[in-house]
């Protein structure tokens, strides 16, 4: 895939997988993401294996894909880089607002449980007033894309 195709796939999707370097084996988990000003942002809950791996500060791989059910058409991108906690209030707010917008349009409110919200929550509750951890992919060292012929 060329750079334009890679960027198109990244901008059109909203779910990815992040692979972390675990202690004895890799660890992979799904995440909602958004693109704001050319950067990828993810929401992390403040618990689970991913947090201990994130705190280690080791490089990660992010995988984004699109495919048809029979795999006659597919495309995927892998990005290698580092994850950084977003502490700037305005940057964090922009990422949260975009995640909530994507969530309202394309995801069930049930998905908010994966974000650490109680069942029955609504996307209007996903705001920068909440203790939501926003993580940015930084220092992207490699982008690889592959698509069906």
What kind of feature is each model-predicted range?
Residues 13-46, 63:
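Short beta-strand segments
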Residues 36, 45, 65, 84-86, ...:
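Solvent-exposed residues in well-ordered beta-strands and their adjoining turns
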Residues 1-17:
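Short, basic/aromatic recognition patches
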């Amino acid at each position: 895939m060329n750079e334009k195709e890679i960027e198109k796939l990244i901008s059109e999707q909203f779910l990815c997988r992040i692979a972390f370097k675990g202690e004895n084996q890799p660890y992979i988990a799904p995440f909602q993401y958004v693109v704001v000003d050319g950067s990828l942002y993810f929401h992390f809950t403040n618990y689970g294996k991913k947090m201990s791996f994130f705190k280690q500060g080791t490089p990660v791989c992010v995988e984004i894909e699109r495919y048809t059910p029979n795999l006659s058409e597919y495309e995927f991108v892998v990005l290698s880089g580092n994850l950084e906690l977003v502490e700037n209030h305005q940057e964090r707010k922009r990422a949260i607002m975009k995640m909530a917008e994507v969530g309202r349009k394309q995801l069930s409110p049930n998905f908010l449980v994966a974000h650490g919200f109680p069942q029955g929550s609504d996307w209007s509750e996903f705001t920068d007033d909440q203790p939501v951890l926003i993580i940015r992919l930084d220092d992207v060292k490699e982008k690889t894309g592959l698509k069906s012929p």
